């Protein structure tokens, strides 16, 4: 049986890892073994932060809604209770976008929520 040398495959694999580690600091960007460790850690961070991003955006939407609703004399929790009572089924993302881009439409929604309380 002939001897199989894997020089080409190893070089390709190393090149792929080094290419993915572009932008890292120190030897993490050009030393294969260290780059591989840093890449695995970066994948862990990416996995974790994809979950955290959802929480962060939800809290951002709530902060925006709360700030906009306070100008109408309500607080966030009372406003959401009024929306539920009025039967208005709009999610927080849309509400925050309305509060920023179309304050008049958001004001109508706030008035509906006030009327339902």
UniProtKB/Swiss-Prot annotation:
Record keyword Ribonucleoprotein present: yes
Stored InterPro entries: Ribosomal_bL20 (IPR005813), RIBOSOMAL_L20_CS (IPR049946), Ribosomal_protein_bL20_C (IPR035566)
UniProt KW keywords: Ribonucleoprotein, Ribosomal protein, RNA-binding, rRNA-binding
PROSITE patterns documented for this protein: RIBOSOMAL_L20 (PS00937)
Keyword Ribosomal protein: yes
GO molecular function: rRNA binding; structural constituent of ribosome
Pfam families reported in the protein's UniProt record: Ribosomal_L20
UniProt GO cellular component terms: ribonucleoprotein complex; ribosome
Domain of life: Bacteria
GO terms under biological process: ribosomal large subunit assembly; translation
Role description: Binds directly to 23S ribosomal RNA and is necessary for the in vitro assembly process of the 50S ribosomal subunit. It is not involved in the protein synthesizing functions of that subunit.
UniProt cross-references to PANTHER family, sorted A to Z: 39S RIBOSOMAL PROTEIN L20
Similarity comment text for this entry: Belongs to the bacterial ribosomal protein bL20 family.
Listed name of the protein: Large ribosomal subunit protein bL20
């Amino acid at each position: 049986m002939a001897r199989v040398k894997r020089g080409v495959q190893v070089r390709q694999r190393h090149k792929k890892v080094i290419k993915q580690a572009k932008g890292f600091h120190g030897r993490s960007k050009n030393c294969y073994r260290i780059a591989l460790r840093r890449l695995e850690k970066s994948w862990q961070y990416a996995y974790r932060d994809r979950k955290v991003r959802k929480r962060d955006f939800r809290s951002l939407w709530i902060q925006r809604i709360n700030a906009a609703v306070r100008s109408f004399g309500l607080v966030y929790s009372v406003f959401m209770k009024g929306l539920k009572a009025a039967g208005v089924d709009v999610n927080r993302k849309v509400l925050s976008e309305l509060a920023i881009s179309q304050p008049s439409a958001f004001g109508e929604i706030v008035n509906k929520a006030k009327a339902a309380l």
